[in-house]
Amino acid sequence: MSDSKDELIRMFFDEEAILFGRFILTSGKESNYYINVKKLSTKPRALKLIAKLMAGEAQKRGITFDRVAGPELGAVPIATALALETEKPLVIVRKKPKGHGTGSQLEGEVKAGDKVLLVEDVTTTGGSVLRAAEVLEREGAEIAAIMVVVDREEGAEETIGAKYTFLPLVRVSELFARRKEPQKE
């Protein structure tokens, strides 16, 4: 494991970005833990590290892309940081077309044939990021890969991987393998 990835995993614990309790996820599933990547993505040091890791992973895998995209809301700061890191244009994918102005579901430009690196904060089943991929493809984009900060390992890799290259920076099993035990007082 790289030092940078190890640092990211430590940040999840240091910033208390893993919560335990009862949570309903975007997928509709119930979970006894919640991975709050948004908490990390509001911290400049963590956000910069995520962008650096994503850019490095794309380069290591030989993934070329013209644009970086992310679905609202959780992926927007991540996609923005990665766009800055790679100096590639940013595209934001809305959950639904806006009801005013142009009525577009995309903010930013996508041209037919553009290769897009689509990023997400957390995946469970992969449904949200797959819907974003469909929106981009309707506009003529090609999905170069889908990269996620944390994969919860609940089906997203199989679902997304059936059609796209799927690259999680961290799997939830890696987070839990490093989970700090409560200190005895």
UniProtKB/Swiss-Prot annotation:
Residues that hold orotate according to the record: 124, 152
Q: Which GO terms describe its molecular function?
A: magnesium ion binding; orotate phosphoribosyltransferase activity
Q: Which InterPro entries match?
A: OPRT, Or_phspho_trans_dom, PRibTrfase_dom, PRTase-like
Query: Where does this protein act, in terms of pathway?
Result: Pyrimidine metabolism; UMP biosynthesis via de novo pathway; UMP from orotate: step 1/2
Root EC class = transferase
Q: Name one Pfam family in it.
A: Pribosyltran
**EC code(s) of this entry:** 2.4.2.10
Q: Which GO terms describe its biological process?
A: 'de novo' UMP biosynthetic process; pyrimidine nucleobase biosynthetic process; UMP biosynthetic process
KW Magnesium (keyword) present: yes
Q: Which residues bind 5-phospho-alpha-D-ribose 1-diphosphate?
A: 94-95, 98, 100, 120-128
Which reactions appear under catalytic activity for this entry?
Answer: orotidine 5'-phosphate + diphosphate = orotate + 5-phospho-alpha-D-ribose 1-diphosphate
Name the cofactor(s) required for activity, per the record: Mg(2+)
Domain of life per record = Archaea
Could you say which protein family the record assigns here?
Belongs to the purine/pyrimidine phosphoribosyltransferase family. PyrE subfamily.
Q: How does it assemble?
A: Homodimer.
Q: What does this protein do?
A: Catalyzes the transfer of a ribosyl phosphate group from 5-phosphoribose 1-diphosphate to orotate, leading to the formation of orotidine monophosphate (OMP).
Q: What is the protein named?
A: Orotate phosphoribosyltransferase
